[in-house]
Amino acid sequence: MKIMGLDPGLNCTGWSILSVSKDIKLIDKGTVVTNSKEDTGQRLRKIHTDVLDILRLYQVDSASMEEIFINKNPKSSISLCYARGILLLTLSTKDIPVFEYSTNYVKKSITGNGHAKKEQVSFMIEKILNVKCSGTYDISDSIAVALCHAYSKKSF
């Protein structure tokens, strides 16, 4: 089974693909980065088309992302909602079910502590999957939510 983990953002969306069978392996990871000088519609189109390309390449069975949270900055929250919405639409066009988990649940499933810092989550991902979490926290957050989904489904 292949799981796509997503960390939505209008500026940068992190993604990862896990293969789950007898064990869990990280197949690929990356980010979709949009140009802040473009209008919102163009940026959402880029997220949509890039994620569609990834879905075509990896043929995932399910996807996971963190539940929405309301930021102190309303503009940031709205941008996050735009990115989440386009991801949900993109996944639904391919009939890929999406599973959502709270931030605290994801952190607890990876580190044992629902209030762990991003550095702790990244460290544990490296230990669990025996990979280097280079790049942004957008990537490690996407891996964490995919791993959380694999654990919650006991798919391996």
From Swiss-Prot:
Q: How is the cofactor bound?
A: Binds 2 Mg(2+) ion per subunit.
Q: Provide the reaction this enzyme catalyses.
A: Endonucleolytic cleavage at a junction such as a reciprocal single-stranded crossover between two homologous DNA duplexes (Holliday junction)
Q: Where is the signal peptide?
A: none
Key words of the record: Cytoplasm, DNA damage, DNA recombination, DNA repair, DNA-binding, Endonuclease, Hydrolase, Magnesium, Metal-binding, Nuclease
CDD domains in alphabetical order: RuvC
Q: Which domain of life is it from?
A: Bacteria
Q: Which Pfam families match?
A: RuvC (PF02075)
Please tell me one Gene Ontology term that the record gives under cellular component: cytoplasm
Please name the GO terms that the record assigns under molecular function: crossover junction DNA endonuclease activity; DNA binding; magnesium ion binding
Q: Which SUPFAM superfamilies match?
A: Ribonuclease H-like
Identify the main location. cytoplasm
Q: Where in the cell is it found?
A: Cytoplasm
Residues at which Mg(2+) 2 binds: 66
Question: Could you say which cofactors this protein requires?
Answer: Mg(2+)
Specify which residues bind Mg(2+) 1 according to the UniProt entry for this protein: 7, 138
Active-site residues are 7, 66, 138
Task: Tell me which Gene Ontology terms the entry assigns under biological process.
Answer: DNA recombination; DNA repair
Q: What is its EC number?
A: 3.1.21.10
Biological role: The RuvA-RuvB-RuvC complex processes Holliday junction (HJ) DNA during genetic recombination and DNA repair. Endonuclease that resolves HJ intermediates. Cleaves cruciform DNA by making single-stranded nicks across the HJ at symmetrical positions within the homologous arms, yielding a 5'-phosphate and a 3'-hydroxyl group; requires a central core of homology in the junction. The consensus cleavage sequence is 5'-(A/T)TT(C/G)-3'. Cleavage occurs on the 3'-side of the TT dinucleotide at the point of strand exchange.
Q: Which NCBIfam families match?
A: ruvC
Q: How does it assemble?
A: Homodimer which binds Holliday junction (HJ) DNA. The HJ becomes 2-fold symmetrical on binding to RuvC with unstacked arms; it has a different conformation from HJ DNA in complex with RuvA. In the full resolvosome a probable DNA-RuvA(4)-RuvB(12)-RuvC(2) complex forms which resolves the HJ.
Write out the similarity annotation: Belongs to the RuvC family.
According to UniProt, the name of this protein is: Crossover junction endodeoxyribonuclease RuvC
Q: Which organism is it from?
A: Ehrlichia chaffeensis (strain ATCC CRL-10679 / Arkansas)
Lineage, broadest ranks? Bacteria, Pseudomonadati, Pseudomonadota, Alphaproteobacteria, Rickettsiales
Gene expressing this chain: ruvC
